[in-house]
């Protein structure tokens, strides 16, 4: 038993780094989940009160950005799905820098035609841990490329599957134990 305690004591810094990386990635994932579900309060919950988001044409304090982006997602697109790639994270005490690759797809109507919008970019984030929770202090978005094209016919009967909801009525909220405005999974 003492060997285990000794091992934990010797590796406490490494274990804390793993925990920090996990919690930071969880914040990044909570943000895109909230955007895809159009949950304004859950998007806002990933930002500190004094945060700022530079998202190209939409740049605002984090809590204002949450409202602006959710309104845009609801009015312009019928669906939105973010896919996250690798994250590079450097933690220094209660501050961290993170770079995360994203691929986003959206569907919208244009003159009666369903259009597929695609973007690939990176989130360049500064996060801070306050009261034990990692949130964005500064979020900057790069855009590597974007594309828009008519969506072809589906090879699968989408209607035969569990239907998504762009709200907390989505099945993910129940299975993850989330409530409206809550983007973080309870630990």
Regions found by a protein language model. Name each.
Residues 1-33, 37, 41-45:
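Short, low-complexity N-terminal intrinsically disordered segments enriched in polar/charged residues
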Residues 2-4, 97-99, 120-160:
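Short beta-strand edge/turn micro-motifs at domain boundaries
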Residues 14, 18, 56, 114:
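Charge-dense, low-complexity intrinsically disordered segments
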Residues 39-107:
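A solvent-exposed, acidic/Ser-Thr-rich amphipathic alpha-helical stretch
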Residues 77, 105-116, 146-147:
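Short, cysteine-centered beta-strand-loop-beta hairpins and adjacent loop/turn segments enriched
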Residues 82-84, 118-123:
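Short, surface-exposed coil-to-beta transition loops
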Residues 144, 156-187:
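A hydrophobic membrane-anchoring alpha-helix module
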């Amino acid at each position: 038993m003492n060997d285990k305690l000794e091992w934990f004591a010797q590796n406490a810094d490494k274990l804390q780094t793993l925990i920090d990386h996990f919690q930071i990635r969880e914040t990044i994932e909570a943000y895109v989940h909230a955007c895809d579900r159009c949950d304004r309060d859950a998007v806002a919950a990933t930002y500190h009160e004094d945060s700022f988001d530079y998202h190209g044409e939409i740049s605002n304090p984090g809590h204002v950005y949450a409202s602006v982006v959710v309104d845009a997602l609801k009015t312009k697109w019928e669906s939105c799905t973010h896919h996250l790639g690798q994250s590079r994270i450097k933690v220094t005490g209660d501050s961290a820098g993170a770079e995360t690759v994203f691929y986003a797809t959206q569907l919208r109507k244009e003159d009666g035609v369903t259009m597929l919008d695609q973007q690939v970019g990176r989130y360049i984030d500064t996060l801070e841990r306050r009261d034990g929770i990692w949130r964005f202090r500064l979020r900057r978005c790069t855009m590597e490329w974007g594309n828009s094209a008519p969506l072809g016919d589906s090879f699968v009967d989408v209607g035969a599957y569990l239907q998504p909801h762009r709200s907390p009525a989505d099945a993910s909220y129940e299975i993850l134990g989330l409530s409206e405005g809550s983007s973080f999974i309870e630990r």
